[in-house]
């Protein structure tokens, strides 16, 4: 499926602020949430609608409302930072959780937690994580949501690189990928360059 880089001056400006080493955890979190919110317009453009009869102050007419449940699936812990921005525009979205960690030596992905929600098989499922680096965590998370029965899945991140994009497309060709930026490369430690650093540490102030 397609890879979409969502380019917009507001997103580019906020992402630049996040990249700076001197940016505080507070500002990092706020900009992350705001970028996630700005990306919602593009990510949800194919959300299903149903017609409804309504009455305005001047006449009766037909309107349209969302007719598809939405489930957000943050990859813990950094994915949590993207929830607030998305939920501001999709307040009825339910939240499932997947906890993964990456072995710093082997770069292999390991699961430590997973909690689904009802009717995920009928829902529009968005897996979120700020970084798409090697693709290990994204692929593992999507493996899990497919085991839960999810069929309509998108992966949303802030920053992605070609190795992660390619791996996700190869393992899950039915999943659309959205990013605010396609960065240059991975370094020898598997970190995105220029990237954001460790997003989880910067969100929670644990660096």
UniProtKB/Swiss-Prot annotation:
Signal peptide: none annotated. It holds the Pfam family UPRTase. Coiled coil: none annotated. Its EC number is 2.4.2.9. Allosterically activated by GTP. Pathway: Pyrimidine metabolism; UMP biosynthesis via salvage pathway; UMP from uracil: step 1/1. InterPro entries: PRibTrfase_dom, PRTase-like, Upp_B, UPRTase/APRTase, Ura_phspho_trans. One of its GO terms (biological process) is UMP salvage. Its cofactor is Mg(2+). GO terms for molecular function: GTP binding; magnesium ion binding; uracil phosphoribosyltransferase activity. Uracil binds at residues 192, 197-199. SUPFAM superfamilies: PRTase-like (SSF53271). Binds 1 Mg(2+) ion per subunit. The magnesium is bound as Mg-PRPP. It catalyses: UMP + diphosphate = 5-phospho-alpha-D-ribose 1-diphosphate + uracil. Keywords: Allosteric enzyme, Glycosyltransferase, GTP-binding, Magnesium, Nucleotide-binding, Transferase. 5-phospho-alpha-D-ribose 1-diphosphate binds at residues 77, 102, 129-137, 198. Catalyzes the conversion of uracil and 5-phospho-alpha-D-ribose 1-diphosphate (PRPP) to UMP and diphosphate. Belongs to the UPRTase family. This is Uracil phosphoribosyltransferase.
């Amino acid at each position: 499926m397609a890879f979409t880089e969502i380019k917009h001056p507001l997103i580019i400006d906020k992402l630049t602020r996040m990249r700076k080493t001197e940016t505080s955890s507070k500002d990092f979190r706020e900009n992350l949430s705001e970028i996630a919110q700005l990306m919602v317009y593009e990510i949800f453009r194919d959300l299903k609608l149903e017609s409804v009869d309504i009455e305005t102050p001047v006449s009766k007419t037909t309107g349209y409302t969302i007719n598809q449940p939405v489930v957000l699936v943050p990859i813990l812990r950094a994915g949590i930072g993207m929830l607030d921005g998305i939920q501001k525009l999709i307040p009825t979205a339910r939240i499932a959780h997947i906890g993964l960690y990456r072995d710093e030596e082997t770069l292999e992905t390991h699961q430590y937690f997973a909690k689904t929600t009802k009717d995920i098989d009928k829902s529009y499922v968005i897996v979120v994580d700020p970084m798409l680096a090697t693709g290990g965590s994204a692929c593992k998370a999507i493996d899990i949501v497919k085991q839960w029965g999810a069929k309509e899945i998108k992966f949303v991140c802030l920053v992605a690189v070609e190795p992660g994009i390619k791996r996700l497309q190869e393992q899950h060709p039915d999943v659309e990928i959205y990013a605010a930026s396609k960065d240059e490369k991975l370094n020898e430690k598997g970190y995105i360059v220029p990237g954001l650093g460790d997003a989880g540490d910067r969100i929670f102030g644990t660096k």
